[in-house]
Amino acid sequence: MHIIAFKNTYKENMNVIHILEPLASNAMAEKINELEHTIGTVLPSHFKDFLTQNNVCKPHKNHYKDKETEFTINYFLGFSENKNDDIIATYNDYEGRMPEELMPIASVDGGDWLCINKMTGKVYYWFHEENDWGLEGNNKYPTLVSENLNDFIEKLTPTPLPTKEEIKRAIASGKVTITPKSVELKNAMRA
């Protein structure tokens, strides 16, 4: 696993990016061309740079919260043999389920997606229960969370620890959800 620090003007706020699947630069250029052909447009330069530097990755600070929206990033998509991590496969799977100008770029807890506008580079939160245009009655536009990916990553904070009340509820219900992907990511971060 490779680790890089995301460029930030304040060193103490630096967000470390854990690269889960590195990809050689010559293969990366080919895959970016394939992605741009698939989506029918040239990617915003800041997102193309992010993909080139990180491919499939997870930021150490991965929690987003503002007045109305809160979520945790599982990992950013990239180019992968694993269909669940591959940005092209995910784009194809969700085509028609979100606005045409958006594409998923990161897995979010609960089956949601962080998306980017293919033309403007603005970043949106796609909440599957309200924004899945493939379901009858759902046609709400996803929530704008940042003007660009760099600003979004700078807004991320460490995932908060559960409150005592949340721990009590989990113990009382006897249910703790651990997905295979979360185990894989935790193991990769320990390596």
Enumerate the predicted regions with their spans.
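Compact, glycine/acidic-enriched structural inserts
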Residues: 129-158
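Short hydrophobic/aromatic-rich beta-strand segments that constitute the beta-sheet cores
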Residues: 125-126
